[in-house]
Regions:
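A short, sequence-level motif marking secondary-structure junctions
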Residues: 55-56, 65-68, 219-224
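Short, surface-exposed, polar/charged, turn-prone segments marking secondary-structure boundaries
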Residues: 40, 67-70, 234-235
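Long, compositionally biased intrinsically disordered terminal regions
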Residues: 89-235
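N-terminal ordered "arm"
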Residues: 1-65
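A broadly used, surface-exposed interaction patch
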Residues: 59-96
Length: 235
């Protein structure tokens, strides 16, 4: 795919289906945060990741076919959505102007690309049910400052619960995954047997659904010392 001439410095999404997927993602992100920025990074030839930080504190990402200038660009989600809306559907290049560079508006590091270890698969319906319960609780408990942190920080689901290293998934992660549209559903029901995969690497938790992934950085695990074992010296 050429990025020379008229398409220099442009985001290229040539397939109308991928543009539709990008448009849907941007609309969902803007519904959560009208001032959201998105970060596009290259995966390999002809594919890119579209990142957004949700207001719940998790990172959402979807892989689409396309190219981004320099392999890494940050732009306003509303600007990119406008670019998509004015682009003719039959446009062959799918060239989108990223607008003014906004790299300084992106906060935080991106997670590692690989090295995650599988923890457990969870039925997607469980995540949908938790989201509906969370929405009900939010309507009942939201105040002038928005949702109470106690609701968002609540561990909604524990996987690998029968081991000495359980993994807790909070409502921030659940809300981010479902509200970004990553879990397929119709009328609040996921396809029968639809899985969501949970994996981890160090302090990073990763949740993969059919249409996208959510990452959440958790508190680093502390080593547990057995009775009688020497503790490290105080610093």
């Amino acid at each position: 795919m050429s990025t020379s001439g008229a398409t220099d410095g442009m985001i290229l999404v040539p397939d109308p289906a991928d543009r539709d997927d990008l448009r849907t993602l941007l609309r969902r992100i803007l519904r959560l945060d009208e001032a959201a920025v998105v970060r596009l990074t290259s995966v390999d030839e002809g594919r890119m990741r579209v990142w957004a930080r949700t207001p719940f504190g998790a990172l959402a990402v979807r892989v689409l076919r396309g190219d981004c200038p320099g392999g890494d660009v940050v732009c306003g989600a509303d600007h990119l959505l406008t670019e998509l809306d004015i682009l003719p559907r039959g446009d062959a290049d799918g060239a989108l102007d990223p607008g003014m560079p906004l790299l300084s508006a992106w906060q935080g590091l991106l997670p590692p690309a690989d090295g995650f270890h599988p923890v457990e698969n969870v039925p997607a319906q469980v995540l949908l049910d938790l989201t509906e319960s969370g929405r009900t609780a939010a309507r009942e408990n939201a105040g002038p400052a928005g949702l109470p942190p106690s609701l968002l920080d609540q561990v909604a689901l524990t996987v690998r619960a029968d081991t000495d290293a359980p993994v807790g998934i909070d409502m921030r992660t659940v809300f981010s995954l479902v509200m970004c549209g990553f879990v397929p559903e119709r009328g609040g029901k996921a396809p029968e047997g639809e899985p969501v995969r949970v994996s981890e690497r160090g302090a990073w938790l990763r949740i993969d659904a059919r249409y996208g992934t959510v990452y959440r950085r958790t508190a680093r695990k502390r080593r547990r010392y057995r009775l009688g074992e020497n503790l490290p010296p105080e610093r």
